[in-house]
Amino acid sequence: MLKTNFKFWRRAFLAVAISAQSQVFAANSDSGSEYPFVFHLIQAALWDEAVAADKTYFPPTYRQDGFTHGTANPDKLLTVANHFYQQTEGDWYCLRMTTESLRASGVTVVFESTAPVGDQPPDFEGSEDELYPHIMGGISTGAVLEVLTVERGEAGEFLRIHGLYPGE
């Protein structure tokens, strides 16, 4: 009897898990379709170091967060940058990728609600308006289509990402 109950509950658990997983994959397959790119804001020195060493880049909060944060909506980039990274000094880049270029490099992109970056909560205006691409691994240099420069003000505020929009 105990063996029969175990088999029943195991099957029930697997059925629920597979169903939930299918729903997540289905939701994620359409989530980023409105925007063709996945962007990642990165300290220039860290990216330059990864490129020079021909290594995959992992952000400083990767171990804590479990993924690399991204943004699909270009209109959200400066808001995200100013919320999470304004206090971090130095030059920054914005990496332009696609889910396909990331997948070709061996990582999956999952569109989910916002999540903390390290210990910084995602409580910026509009944080709950859309799903954000979470890159389930590091970023290889081959996954990046373009490296955009970021302009910052004297107080560290992020002002502009050069070349973000066509015709700039």
Regions found by a protein language model. Give the residues of each.
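Bacterial N-terminal signal peptides that target proteins for export
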Residues: 2-12
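Bacterial N-terminal signal peptides
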Residues: 11-21
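Boundary at the C-terminal end of the N-terminal hydrophobic targeting segment
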Residues: 24-26
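Conserved, structured core segments of small domains
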Residues: 30-168
